[in-house]
Amino acid sequence: MPANYQSVPQDDPSVPNLAQAPPAYSEYNESATENPAVDQFKNTTPVAECAKSIRMAFLRKVYAILTAQLFVTSLFGGIFYLHPAFSFWVQMHPWFLILNFFISLVVLFGLIMKPYSYPRNYIFLFLFTALEGLTLGTAITFFSARIILEAVFITLGVFVALTAFTFQSKWDFSRLGGFLYVSLWSLILTPLIFFFVPSTPFIDMAFAGFGTLVFCGYILFDTYNILHRYSPEEFIMSSLMLYLDFINLFIRILQILGMLQNNDNN
């Protein structure tokens, strides 16, 4: 004999009403639609496809960090230039530059591994910038103050012009990647040849000029990528890439101006 089933009173608050329709999806997703900027920061949407407010906030952050990096580098450069004893000690102890190079690689590796880990990403970025400032501060002591200032202003002008051109251009500069990659390795490996084959002033000038063109290309390439390939969360790595482009371009322009000055003196 089947059991007698008794219907549950619908007004009993202790029993859920399973027949009731579930709430609309928008009720669960309400918090996500209240602030669309939050969703865009959580996914991998490229900066160029984000809302204008997010794009502008990202660019302000990137170039503010870049400005701070250049300030720290200039500070170290000024200390070394105004106090030659520091640079003289480094020149007399080349092991320091070698150690500085390997520490820079370790710090850079840590930054690449933890680009979103606050505050470690800022600490790694500051340490890397300081170490680069030590190396650059030693290098610029071989040049006159006039040449250094000329190189700074030329580099700044070229950097701003190329950045502005990339922002308004419709060209896809990511296509330069293959050429720039091969060119960069050429810049790294070619000096090894000079250990066996003596260089000439013409070769040195051509090599510095080629390096200038390569890092001008990298400014176009990296500026395009931070807009079209990077998400708004990747501001630390964006600043780092632009910083390395600026410093490497400055070094090549400084070399060219120094060689031109030597030719005039001769």
From Swiss-Prot:
| Transmembrane spans | 70-90, 92-112, 123-143, 147-167, 177-197, 201-221, 240-260
Membrane-related topology note: Multi-pass membrane protein
Q: Which domain of life is it from?
A: Eukaryota
Q: Which CDD domains match?
A: GAAP_like (cd10429)
Identify the stretch annotated as signal peptide in this record.
none
Subcellular localization is given as: Endoplasmic reticulum membrane; Mitochondrion membrane; Golgi apparatus membrane; Vacuole membrane
One GO cellular component this record assigns the protein to is: membrane
GO terms classed as biological process: calcium-mediated signaling; endoplasmic reticulum unfolded protein response
Per the UniProt entry, the disulfide pairs are none
**Start and end residues of each stretch annotated as Disordered:** 1-22
Ordered alphabetically, the record's keywords are: Apoptosis, Endoplasmic reticulum, Golgi apparatus, Membrane, Mitochondrion, Transmembrane, Transmembrane helix, Vacuole
Q: Which residues form a coiled coil?
A: none
Q: GO terms for molecular function, please?
A: calcium channel activity
Tell me, in one coarse class, where this protein mainly resides: endoplasmic reticulum
The protein's matches in InterPro entries, at most eight in alphabetical order, are given as: Bax_inhibitor_1-related (IPR006214)
Free-text function comment from the UniProt entry: Links the unfolded protein response and programmed cell death and mediates mitochondrial-dependent apoptosis. Induces cell death and disruption of the mitochondrial transmembrane potential.
Q: Which PANTHER family match?
A: BAX INHIBITOR-RELATED, PROTEIN LIFEGUARD 4
Instruction: Give the protein family.
Output: Belongs to the BI1 family. LFG subfamily.
Record-given protein name: Bax inhibitor 1
